[in-house]
């Protein structure tokens, strides 16, 4: 049947969506239809402990060729709460057996505090427990421009106290994970997994920046904050009361 469709000249949906050429032979990137793509992920241990509203917004506003992908997976409360309780009890037992001058002591103390915080938030504040995975996609027309943009993203993440890792030898899997198929590669998911509660997840909502972009507007310039075009149509009566809004 496939040969008949091919000989008959029929075009399927897969033919329209699939790229014409894919080069997977490089460690640092993948080339899809002559566009270079590279991917990074925020390590599971690489997040800030306390975050504010719009804490992912700087990555969304990173400029041309930078895209953000994040995945959330809600966990059942009846399974998570017992696990947190057991882990906290185990850490308390281990803490009694080590001296307070060892580095392990501070790590266990931090783990116990985190466990108690999560239990309190879930029991008293009715928050839900999620696993979050964050990937950053970078694209460019050349390998040199791609490397420049990757370096800029790494510098930006360092300023946000985020630890990012490149998906070396896994850019094909990362590219597949970036497609709207709700399928994250298990190896990347394992390295990028971070637990998060409802409030912090809501604060990750990235669309917090302002923009002015009328479809038939006149270009006034570029937004310095997120590199978006500033375009205003002063004669659009449905948006503005007077055409002399800008002089």
Language-model regions, residue ranges each:
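Glycine-rich phosphate-binding loop of nucleotide-binding enzymes
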Residues: 215-247
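Extended, folded cores of ATP/NTP-driven motor/assembly subunits in large transport
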Residues: 1-209
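Generic structural "secondary-structure junction" signal
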Residues: 198, 203, 207-214, 222, ...
């Amino acid at each position: 049947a496939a040969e008949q469709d091919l000989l008959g000249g029929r075009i399927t949906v897969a033919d329209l969506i699939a790229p014409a050429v894919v080069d997977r032979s490089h460690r640092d990137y993948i080339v899809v239809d002559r566009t270079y793509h590279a991917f990074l992920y925020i390590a599971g241990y690489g997040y800030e402990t306390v975050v504010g509203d719009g804490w992912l917004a700087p990555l969304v506003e990173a400029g041309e060729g930078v895209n953000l992908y994040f995945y959330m997976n809600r966990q059942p409360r009846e399974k998570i709460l017992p696990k947190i309780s057991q882990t906290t009890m185990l850490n308390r037992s281990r803490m009694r057996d080590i001296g307070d001058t060892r580095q392990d002591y501070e790590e266990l103390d931090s783990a116990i505090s985190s466990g108690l915080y999560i239990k309190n938030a879930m029991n008293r504040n009715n928050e839900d427990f999620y696993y979050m995975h964050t990937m950053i996609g970078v694209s460019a027309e050349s390998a040199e421009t791609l490397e420049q943009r990757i370096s800029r993203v790494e510098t930006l993440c360092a300023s946000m106290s985020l630890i990012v890792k490149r998906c070396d030898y896994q850019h094909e899997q990362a590219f597949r994970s970036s497609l709207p198929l709700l399928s994250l590669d298990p190896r990347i998911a394992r390295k990028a997994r971070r637990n998060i509660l409802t409030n912090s997840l809501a604060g990750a909502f990235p669309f917090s920046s302002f923009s002015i972009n009328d479809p038939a507007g006149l270009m006034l310039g570029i937004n310095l904050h997120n590199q978006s075009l500033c375009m205003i149509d002063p004669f659009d009566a449905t948006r503005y009361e007077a055409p002399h809004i800008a002089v």
